[in-house]
């Protein structure tokens, strides 16, 4: 299972800039401070990030709506790079099912998959009406669709919150460096496993599967 933004596509820098502009304008905080808070709480839907940073603030709903509208331009302009696609194809060659698990709205995730043309086995986004969201709802859906156990699932994400969600769901986690550094993941868990890029996952997983056999 792959997180989308910051893991499969390099959108986090653009998202962080937009989030900082929105919070600076609507909450009256410094741009640099707001950007740092966005990155720090990444891995949650932006509406929930705002509740962490500004609990029960009257501006949160409008700020969330503005961010979600403005981030679409970044989504539309950003594609998976060639190395990411190469890595995904190699993972499929190992017989693995490939799932997108994102807090971005389901319609945006569907548009991403259609635009990229890569045949993910399952693409899940944030859809409250369907009870879908990154974490337990997505894990339960994947378990049901593929008929596998939690021990057979692996979540790959770029944020510390992604690692928290994986732990809460009882699935293994591999960090994708970029949004956070190796020392950030190690500070959270000294035994953390991470890769600089998705393209390095196939070799790592081959070694892991060999060790498990």
Predicted region positions:
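Acidic, Mg2+-coordinating phosphoryl-transfer loop and its flanking beta/alpha structural elements
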Residues: 154-194
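A short, structured active-site edge motif that brings together acidic residues
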Residues: 37-38, 118-133
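Non-catalytic pre-domain segments flanking phosphatase-related domains
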Residues: 1-2, 210-213
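Short acidic capping loops at alpha-helix termini that bridge into adjacent secondary structure
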Residues: 33-35, 120-122, 150-153
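Short, acidic loop-to-helix structural element flanking the phosphoryl-transfer center
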Residues: 72-100, 106-114, 133-136
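N-terminal helical cap/lid subdomain that shapes the substrate entry/recognition surface
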Residues: 1-89, 93
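Surface-exposed amphipathic alpha-helices with a cationic face
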Residues: 85-93, 143, 163-167
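Conserved Lys-Pro-Asp/Glu-containing loop-to-beta segment of HAD-superfamily phosphomonoesterases
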Residues: 135-163
């Amino acid at each position: 299972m792959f997180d989308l933004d910051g893991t499969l596509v390099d959108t986090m820098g653009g998202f962080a800039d937009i989030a900082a502009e929105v919070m600076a304008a609507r909450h009256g905080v410094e741009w640099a401070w707001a950007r740092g808070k966005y990155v720090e709480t990444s891995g949650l839907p932006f509406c929930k990030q705002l509740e962490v940073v500004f609990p029960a603030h009257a501006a949160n709903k409008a700020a969330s709506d503005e961010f979600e509208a403005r981030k679409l331009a970044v989504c539309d302009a950003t594609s998976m790079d060639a190395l990411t696609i190469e890595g995904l194809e190699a993972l499929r060659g190992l017989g693995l099912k490939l799932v997108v698990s994102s807090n971005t709205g389901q319609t945006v995730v569907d548009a991403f998959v259609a635009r990229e043309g890569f045949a993910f086995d399952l693409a899940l986004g944030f859809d409250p009406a369907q009870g879908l969201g990154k974490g337990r709802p997505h894990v339960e859906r994947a378990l049901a669709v593929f008929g596998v156990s939690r021990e057979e699932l692996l979540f790959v994400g770029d944020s510390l919150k992604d690692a928290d969600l994986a732990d809460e769901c009882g699935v293994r986690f591999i960090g994708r460096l970029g949004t956070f550094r190796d020392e950030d993941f190690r500070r959270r868990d000294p035994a953390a496993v991470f890769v600089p890029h998705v393209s390095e996952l196939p070799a790592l997983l081959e070694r892991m599967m060999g060790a498990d056999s």
